[in-house]
Amino acid sequence: MLVSLPLLNKGLFVSMSELLQFLQQRNSAPKLIAPAPSAEELEGIYRAALRAPDHAWLRPWRLITIAGDRRQAFGELLEQCLVQRSPDSDEAARAKARNAPLRAPMLVVPVVTLSEHPKVPAMEQRFSAACAAHAILLAAEASGYAGIWRTGDAAFDRAVMTSLGLGFHEEIIGFLYLGTRDGQPKSIPQLDTADFVSSW
């Protein structure tokens, strides 16, 4: 059976076995360079994210993009929030925070928007947003790009969230760095499924 991913790979048809192999080989790319996905490619990537598992169709997520000069502004924000959290931070730590957004040509910040629901607890809504984030990484890879999911203290800092426009009922799921892989994919040891799967 062949499947087509027209928005992700411009109409290339792949077999289901090739698709499965792609999923089995995906890995994170800590070193990213330009270009980032185009506007058209991002549309396809975001559409993949919108198909995340979503109990009761709450759609408990939204996405914030940071690209171009806004990365530098975001780095300055991260530095300011670091100093607020840790006034004794040295210059190396401050520089690391300031330069973090410059490690890729763009960032996507998945946000979970929590709501009260009798059948969908907050944790399940967070899971849904995390699935959307994972779908972005997979779709970016399918589009010929790469990415890495990072968190760190900034992801849990309410000052960072407020500065990004999050409400009290919203949280950052992570920072997705997207771009073109710089170099060859790193070698990852093959895991044995028997170490992770059991029968009851």
Residue ranges and their predicted role:
Residues 103-109:
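A structural motif
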Residues 5-103, 200:
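N-terminal amphipathic, basic helical "cap/leader" segment at the start of enzyme domains
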Residues 49, 108, 114-163:
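Small-aliphatic-rich amphipathic alpha-helix that forms the alpha element of a beta-alpha
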Residues 160-173:
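Short, electropositive alpha-helical surface patch
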Residues 15-22, 172-200:
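C-terminal helix-cap and adjacent tail motif
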Residues 69-73, 79-80, 114-116, 158, ...:
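Short, charged/polar surface micro-motifs in flexible loops or helix N-caps
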